[in-house]
C-alpha cells in the first residue's frame, strides 16, 4: 500500500476542486457573454440526459461491474437512502425551528434531500486516478459506483415523485384573482414626447433589449390573453399601446375557454418606439450602428411599399374559411398592422432574434430561465405549444400532420423522457388512461404506470441494460474481456464482437461531465439574490452547514460501520467506501432550479421560490471548496491510513 504525506494528501484533495471550478467558471463566463443562452443551456442539457449520460453509464457499468459486485450495488442503494433521509431530516428540523417562507416549505425539503450526485463526484474521481492514490481501474469502478448513486437519485426524484415536494409550493390564480387586459392596459405608461430628444444609440439598444425580453413574453401574453367563450365573447377594447407589445403575431388555441385575460404580474412594454426623429435619422442614414452593420435584428422599413407587401403576404396566408375562433386575433392583427401602427414599423417584432445578436444585449437572468423552463400559466394550466403561435396556416397544417415521427415527437411520453423538468402531478394522474376500466379503478394504477414510464428514461434504461449485461458473464464477454468473463470467439481484430459499441459509448460519454459542469456554471451565472424572506438567511446558512459540515461526519461513521459489520473491507473496497464518503458532502442538486422554474408562471415578477433556491445554492458552492478537500484529506490519512 502506498503511503503519502499530509501535504500530498491535501494537494491531491484540492487539485480536483481547481479543475472543477475552472470548468464551472467557463460556463459562468459563457453565460455572462451571451454565448450560452438559456435556450442553448436547455438544448445541451437535454443532449446530456438523452445521449451523453446514458452512454457514459452503459460504458462504465459494463466495463467495471461484475456479478460479484451485486453486494456493492445493494450497499450503494442503502447508502443513497440514508443520504436522502438524513438530508430530509435536517431540512425538516430547519423548517420547523427557523424562518422559512411557506411558499418554499416543500422546496427546502427537496433541497436538503437530493445532492448533486452526478457530474461533481465523477469529475473529482477522474482527477484522482493518476496512480498516486487510486489506479485508473479503481477510478473507472468509482465512476460506475457514482452512476448507481445517480440511478437511485433518478428513481426517487422522478419515479417515486420526489418532484412533488417542489410542485406543492405553488398556488396559482383563479378566474377571480386574475386581472383583465383592460385593467392592465390602464397602467401602461404613455410614450412621452420628450423621448424624441434621446440619443439615437441609447434608444436603439433600449429597443433591442425590449424586443429581447418580449421574445419570451409577447407570444404567451397574447395567446393566453385571447380566448373565446363562444361566438359572442365579450372582448374589451385593446389599445394601441397593448398591441404594440405583441410580437410575433399568434393564433389562439381554439380549445381555450378562458375569457380575455392577462396575468397580474405582466409588465406592459412598448416594444417599438417609432418617433419622427428616428424616421428622419434612418432616412439620412445617420444611425452609426446601421452604418457599421452592427449585430442587430431591427430592420426599419422606410418605404410603405415594403411594409404593405409584408402585411399582404401575411394576410394571404389566412384561409377564407377561417373559423370564428380566430376572429379576435385577426382583428387585433389588422388593427396593429394597419392605421394604428406607423408605416416604418420595425419588422423585428415579427422575426426572432438571432442568437449571435443576443450577445450584444444584457446578460440573461433568472427571469429568462423561468420563461424558458416554465410549463404553466398563471392558472396552473399547462402552457400551450409555443411553436404553434405565430405560425401560418401551412405550418400549422404540417405540424398537425399524422406522420409517425410527428406523433412520436408530440407524445407526452416523449416530453417526459427527453427532458429533466417537464413532469408534474397531472402526469401522474393521467398515467394509465389507456388501460382497461377494470385496471384503472385501482388507486395505485396511475402511480405504477408513472413509475414504469420513468424507467424508460434513457439513463435509467442504460443502467438497467448495463447491469443486466454486467451480471451475466457470457453476455458481458460480447462487449469486454476481463479475467472473469468466459472465452468466446473474437472478432477479426481479436476484440469482443460488440466492442465497437463500447468504443461508441466511451467516446460519446466522455463529453458528459465537462458539458455538465459547464451547464452548472452557466446556471449559477444567471442566479441572483433578491429580496429574501425576513430571517430566511438563518435557515439557509444553518441547513448548508448541516449538509456540508455535519453530514460528512455521518458519512465517515457509516463507512466505519460497514467495515466493522464485515460487509466491506479497506483492501478490496476502498474505492467504494471513498465514493460513499464524498457523497455525503455534495451540494444540492442543480435540477432543483429547473424544477422550480418549471412550476413558476413566466409572468411572475417576484418569484420567491426562485429567490430562495438561488440564495441556498449560491451558499453551498463556495463552502464546498473547503469542506470537500478537508473531508478527503481526513479520509485518506485517517480512515484509509495512507
UniProtKB/Swiss-Prot annotation:
<feature type="transmembrane region" description="Helical">
    <location>
        <begin position="461"/>
        <end position="481"/>
    </location>
</feature>
<feature type="topological domain" description="Cytoplasmic">
    <location>
        <begin position="1"/>
        <end position="15"/>
    </location>
</feature>
<keyword id="KW-0812">Transmembrane</keyword>
<dbReference type="GO" id="GO:0005783">
    <property type="term" value="C:endoplasmic reticulum"/>
</dbReference>
<feature type="topological domain" description="Cytoplasmic">
    <location>
        <begin position="482"/>
        <end position="499"/>
    </location>
</feature>
<feature type="transmembrane region" description="Helical">
    <location>
        <begin position="539"/>
        <end position="559"/>
    </location>
</feature>
<feature type="transmembrane region" description="Helical">
    <location>
        <begin position="500"/>
        <end position="520"/>
    </location>
</feature>
<feature type="topological domain" description="Cytoplasmic">
    <location>
        <begin position="560"/>
        <end position="574"/>
    </location>
</feature>
<feature type="topological domain" description="Cytoplasmic">
    <location>
        <begin position="64"/>
        <end position="73"/>
    </location>
</feature>
<feature type="compositionally biased region" description="Polar residues">
    <location>
        <begin position="272"/>
        <end position="312"/>
    </location>
</feature>
<feature type="region of interest" description="Disordered">
    <location>
        <begin position="183"/>
        <end position="206"/>
    </location>
</feature>
<keyword id="KW-0813">Transport</keyword>
<comment type="similarity">
    <text>Belongs to the auxin efflux carrier (TC 2.A.69) family.</text>
</comment>
<dbReference type="Pfam" id="PF03547">
    <property type="entry name" value="Mem_trans"/>
</dbReference>
<feature type="transmembrane region" description="Helical">
    <location>
        <begin position="74"/>
        <end position="94"/>
    </location>
</feature>
<protein>
    <recommendedName>
        <fullName>Uncharacterized transporter YNL095C</fullName>
    </recommendedName>
</protein>
<feature type="transmembrane region" description="Helical">
    <location>
        <begin position="143"/>
        <end position="163"/>
    </location>
</feature>
<feature type="topological domain" description="Extracellular">
    <location>
        <begin position="596"/>
        <end position="614"/>
    </location>
</feature>
<feature type="transmembrane region" description="Helical">
    <location>
        <begin position="43"/>
        <end position="63"/>
    </location>
</feature>
<feature type="transmembrane region" description="Helical">
    <location>
        <begin position="575"/>
        <end position="595"/>
    </location>
</feature>
<feature type="transmembrane region" description="Helical">
    <location>
        <begin position="615"/>
        <end position="635"/>
    </location>
</feature>
<dbReference type="InterPro" id="IPR040254">
    <property type="entry name" value="Ecm3-like"/>
</dbReference>
<dbReference type="GO" id="GO:0016020">
    <property type="term" value="C:membrane"/>
</dbReference>
<feature type="transmembrane region" description="Helical">
    <location>
        <begin position="105"/>
        <end position="125"/>
    </location>
</feature>
<feature type="transmembrane region" description="Helical">
    <location>
        <begin position="16"/>
        <end position="36"/>
    </location>
</feature>
<dbReference type="InterPro" id="IPR004776">
    <property type="entry name" value="Mem_transp_PIN-like"/>
</dbReference>
<feature type="region of interest" description="Disordered">
    <location>
        <begin position="227"/>
        <end position="324"/>
    </location>
</feature>
<feature type="topological domain" description="Extracellular">
    <location>
        <begin position="95"/>
        <end position="104"/>
    </location>
</feature>
<dbReference type="GO" id="GO:0055085">
    <property type="term" value="P:transmembrane transport"/>
</dbReference>
<feature type="topological domain" description="Extracellular">
    <location>
        <begin position="521"/>
        <end position="538"/>
    </location>
</feature>
<keyword id="KW-0472">Membrane</keyword>
<feature type="topological domain" description="Extracellular">
    <location>
        <begin position="37"/>
        <end position="42"/>
    </location>
</feature>
<feature type="topological domain" description="Cytoplasmic">
    <location>
        <begin position="636"/>
        <end position="642"/>
    </location>
</feature>
<feature type="topological domain" description="Cytoplasmic">
    <location>
        <begin position="126"/>
        <end position="142"/>
    </location>
</feature>
<keyword id="KW-1133">Transmembrane helix</keyword>
<feature type="compositionally biased region" description="Polar residues">
    <location>
        <begin position="240"/>
        <end position="260"/>
    </location>
</feature>
<feature type="topological domain" description="Extracellular">
    <location>
        <begin position="164"/>
        <end position="460"/>
    </location>
</feature>
